[in-house]
A protein has these predicted regions:
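Basic, amphipathic alpha-helical/coil surface patches used to engage anionic, phosphate-bearing ligands
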Residues: 1-239
Length: 239
């Protein structure tokens, strides 16, 4: 298994992706597929959030390609290991090696779970399971109605049992459960928390803010989503 992992890294030039792959369409992608890292939970782990209900896969692939999305996912996992985890570890003075993921599933129905959206989610899930299986601490699925719960077995069947055991479905009153694990001021307003990231163009999911990037902001060419940062020299970048 480990040899397969090493061969994959060599074949895909993974070490180069982390520093050399420019995903310049990221801001357009986030409009169609809202997602991002945002602060930490009470254990000091990075929070990763997706508004999965807003994902339009057809529209997504008008601004990027599946191949580039795969490279982007791999790059972000590498940055999680080499940049975000070390920043979080330094902040809490102990090793942080897992993240907490939140997926907002509001409005997802049968067509989402059996069509293009499911294929896209499965693509992302396979990357995580095959090459970065230990990085997920917990995952919380928000706004899971009765239909979603009924169809959960379909999605779960594609997942590793160990990974599936880390996933918890919450209904519409999820905030009372989330605040057990995350300070409310670290939860974005878009999922009923108190953080607005008003200094970030686009809001919380454009911030990538946390101990690894205290000022927040995503650099794309000469543009930074932090309204107070003007150039690439101003932003904290992954090493």
């Amino acid at each position: 298994m480990f040899q397969k992992f090493l061969k994959w890294r060599e074949d895909e030039k993974v070490d180069e992706l982390r520093t050399n792959f420019d995903f310049n369409e990221i801001l357009e992608v986030k409009k169609i597929y809202p997602h991002g890292y945002h602060k930490v939970d009470k254990m000091g782990r990075p929070l990763y959030i997706e508004l999965l209900s807003k994902l339009d896969v057809g529209k997504l692939f008008t601004v990027t390609t599946e191949e580039r999305m795969v490279k982007y996912y791999v790059r972000e996992y590498e940055r999680l290991m080499k940049w975000r985890f070390p920043g979080c570890s330094a902040a809490v003075k102990k090793p942080v090696e897992q993240s907490l993921t939140i997926l907002d599933c509001n409005g997802l129905g049968v067509t989402s779970l059996v069509g293009k959206t499911r294929s896209f989610v499965q693509l992302a899930t396979n990357i995580a399971q095959d090459y970065y299986p230990e990085m997920l601490g917990q995952m919380y699925l928000l706004n899971t109605g009765w239909l979603f719960k009924a169809l959960w077995a379909i999605v779960k069947s594609f997942m590793d049992p160990k990974t599936a055991g880390k996933i918890h479905m919450l209904g519409g009153s999820y905030i009372t459960e989330l605040v057990k694990y995350i300070d409310e001021q670290n939860i974005p307003e878009c999922i009923n928390g108190k953080c607005k990231c008003e200094n970030i163009e686009g809001g919380c999911l454009y911030s990538d803010i946390g101990p690894w990037n205290p000022n927040g902001g995503i650099q794309v060419g000469n543009i930074n989503t932090n309204k107070g940062l003007k150039s690439v020299q101003d932003v904290v970048t992954a090493k």
